[in-house]
Amino acid sequence: MDQKQIEEIVRSVMASMGQAAPAPSEAKCATTNCAAPVTSESCALDLGSAEAKAWIGVENPHRADVLTELRRSTVARVCTGRAGPRPRTQALLRFLADHSRSKDTVLKEVPEEWVKAQGLLEVRSEISDKNLYLTRPDMGRRLCAEAVEALKAQCVANPDVQVVISDGLSTDAITVNYEEILPPLMAGLKQAGLKVGTPFFVRYGRVKIEDQIGEILGAKVVILLVGERPGLGQSESLSCYAVYSPRMATTVEADRTCISNIHQGGTPPVEAAAVIVDLAKRMLEQKASGINMTR
């Protein structure tokens, strides 16, 4: 699917929702609108600031303008320079700061108050705490007994599409992108004439937990929005895993269709919502997902 097709899907879905389509988006770079690149090292520099991200560590460059343009065009670690065979102090400190940020978002919990504020039913997997979640991924693939009963009692049965939100490995991905992806996604699915299930939040969930959810609720399509494993300096990336007629015993990873890198610096959440709506419609038409779908 090329950019033109994606933009057409966005316009179509937004028009059906009675909203103006957003302007065609471009991949955003965190350094695009930052201050002029800095070449000197400073202990007082905030390592998470735009100034630190724009820092150029190459001393006495032959073409400083080329390095400046390169630095502004990407969030990758370029133009950091060297001190002999080793990285410069500023580059190393920023690397460590970004690594710490990534670890923090993995270990953080989605606040219960936040879940209640969104009006979401909260259930959990067989995991009871974050440490167990990181060490026993198999337990994160199954709902606890209380969760199974809650879904049967409080969720719409036999929906065309069931939307599930889970913290996964990034709390920030859920809390930052939620407002921009779930409302347009739910509205788009309903505008398409589909029976949409009750959206809910799964704490400590892994991707395969959507198979059990689909089986319990009798959903034709299950869409799981889950926090991605964070990269260095990027802790807000969300993924969508969609699967048709999932079954715990027979569904394999190749049966899933994944849309990753959903965040303001990648695929914008509103745009992703429109693409997911179109994907769900095609899954229902073809009665397939993953590698079984025709392009």
From Swiss-Prot:
Catalytic activity: ethanolamine = acetaldehyde + NH4(+)
Cofactor(s) this protein cannot do without: adenosylcob(III)alamin
Principal localisation: other
Cofactor mode of binding and number, as noted: Binds 1 AdoCbl between the large and small subunits, with 6 cofactors per holoenzyme.
Matches recorded under Pfam families: EutC (PF05985)
GO biological process, one term: amino acid metabolic process
Summary of activators and inhibitors of this protein: Inhibited by 5-adeninylpentylcobalamin (AdePeCbl), a cofactor analog. Irreversibly inhibited during catalysis by cleavage of the Co-C bond of the cobalamin coenzyme. Reactivated by EutA, which probably involves an ATP-dependent cobalamin exchange.
Cell location: Bacterial microcompartment
Quaternary state and interactors: The basic unit is a heterodimer, which further associates into a trimer of heterotetramers. 6 large subunits form a core ring with 6 small subunits projecting outwards.
HAMAP family: EutC (MF_00601)
Family: Belongs to the EutC family.
Function in brief: Catalyzes the deamination of various vicinal amino-alcohols to oxo compounds. Ethanolamine ammonia-lyase (EAL) allows bacteria to utilize ethanolamine as the sole source of nitrogen and carbon in the presence of external vitamin B12. It is spontaneously inactivated by its substrate and reactivated by EutA. Directly targeted to the BMC. May play a role in bacterial microcompartment (BMC) assembly or maintenance.
Protein name: Ethanolamine ammonia-lyase small subunit
Organism, as annotated: Escherichia coli (strain K12)
Lineage, highest ranks first: Bacteria, Pseudomonadati, Pseudomonadota, Gammaproteobacteria, Enterobacterales
The gene coding this protein: eutC
